Amino acid sequence: MPGIKRILTVTILALCLPSPGNAQAQCTNGFDLDRQSGQCLDIDECRTIPEACRGDMMCVNQNGRYLCIPRTNPVYRGPYSNPYSTPYSGPYPAAAPPLSAPNYPTISRPLICRFGYQMDESNQCVDVDECATDSHQCNPTQICINTEGGYTCSCTDGYWLLEGQCLDIDECRYGYCQQLCANVPGSYSCTCNPGFTLNEDGRSCQDVNECATENPCVQTCVNTYGSFICRCDPGYELEEDGVHCSDMDECSFSEFLCQHECVNQPGTYFCSCPPGYILLDDNRSCQDINECEHRNHTCNLQQTCYNLQGGFKCIDPIRCEEPYLRISDNRCMCPAENPGCRDQPFTILYRDMDVVSGRSVPADIFQMQATTRYPGAYYIFQIKSGNEGREFYMRQTGPISATLVMTRPIKGPREIQLDLEMITVNTVINFRGSSVIRLRIYVSQYPF
């Protein structure tokens, strides 16, 4: 008799029993006797017991008992039970008359299912699927999950539950992405900085080798972490766009790059020398070519080839004017017995020298010295002619010697002829005479 068992099971929850030796009836736990009606009524523990449930638990009254359930995961009651309403008010069986021996009556009473359950056609309490019947109270951001006797509201991925509401989780705060993170409702997306690409895991970034994929540089591409740099070949410099290379004009950097002339070329430069010079192994310095030594001159047999810096000079044989006589290839003498030689220098010696253009000054360029020293004689050195520009002077360095000093830089090409006179004075024999060095100075065109 399964139906009778179910009725007895429910009836036992609120059974009135006579107490031996006491005429008053008693009720089971969770019920209290209503003396006016003589019925056992449910006790609302949620109202009568202080702090029946503590913390985040909520008290739910039931017939003969109460439950504590979490506030954040409420379980809603079925249509046959409402703990917040007054107890069941249907007809209860009358109190049994006192008997000498207990005799439990059979009480006919409707079956009441616990909340979250409902009666099926076979009078069985079955779970109510609140999620399927749309009888839940989950908000649109939540997912309804049916449970035995109730349901729970859960949050979808990307949300977390707070005070009954599903709030978006800001995944970007927790460093889910390696580089750039964009939070969106319920999710997030990772992106990478320029120069990187997103890996298959959707979170980490990998460097893009721009040099291997597109090679944006005109000359040399060097891949770097997250970017690239362009480099230029020697002799070129990188333009402002960081991609193109333009020729570097090395000649404009310094006037001392080459000794003579700097010639710029795409990606390089070279030094050149003027005619009469050759370029040395350092590829910048120029050295004079000795045309006279290499017989690369145009002098005839009567002339003498004199090498200059950057050229040569064909010197004609000297001509001694009257009353002088030529006594060698470079010397003229005025005979003492000739009356015309009384006030003339005794000898004229021809000398040649060259100096570079713009030579630094002061510079000692020529030395003059008496070949014979007579007792009681002294010597005076002076520039007799050719120094109209006051570019030279004679400095006596000893009793019988002097030095020609250049005092001003001279720009070439230029030829200068100086007559340097040495006067001999002898007071013992009352003698005064002189001799002259006719110095021809060739100033080169270049300062080397």
UniProtKB/Swiss-Prot annotation:
GO terms for molecular function: calcium ion binding; integrin binding; protein homodimerization activity. One of its GO terms (cellular component) is collagen-containing extracellular matrix. One of its GO terms (biological process) is cell adhesion. It is found in: Secreted; Secreted, Extracellular space, Extracellular matrix. InterPro entries: cEGF (IPR026823), EGF-like_Ca-bd_dom (IPR001881), EGF-like_dom (IPR000742), EGF-type_Asp/Asn_hydroxyl_site (IPR000152), EGF_Ca-bd_CS (IPR018097), Fibulin_C (IPR055088), Growth_fac_rcpt_cys_sf (IPR009030), Nephronectin_domain (IPR052235). Residues 1-23 form the signal peptide. Residues 42-82, 127-167, 168-206, 207-246, 247-287, 288-333 form the EGF-like domain. Disulfide bonds join C46-C59, C53-C68, C131-C144, C138-C153, C155-C166, C172-C181, C177-C190, C192-C205, C211-C221, C217-C230, C232-C245, C251-C262, C258-C271, C273-C286, C292-C305, C299-C314, C320-C332. Residues 245-448 are annotated as: Interaction with LOXL1. A motif (Cell attachment site) lies at residues 54-56. Its main location: secreted. Homodimer. Monomer, homodimerizes in presence of Ca(2+). Interacts with ELN. Interacts (via N-terminus) with the integrins ITGAV/ITGB3, ITGAV/ITGB5 and ITGA9/ITGB1. Interacts with FBN1 (via N-terminal domain). Forms a ternary complex with ELN and FBN1. Interacts with EFEMP2 with moderate affinity. Interacts with LOXL1. Essential for elastic fiber formation, is involved in the assembly of continuous elastin (ELN) polymer and promotes the interaction of microfibrils and ELN. Stabilizes and organizes elastic fibers in the skin, lung and vasculature. Promotes adhesion of endothelial cells through interaction of integrins and the RGD motif. Vascular ligand for integrin receptors which may play a role in vascular development and remodeling. May act as an adapter that mediates the interaction between FBN1 and ELN. Belongs to the fibulin family. This is Fibulin-5. The gene is FBLN5.
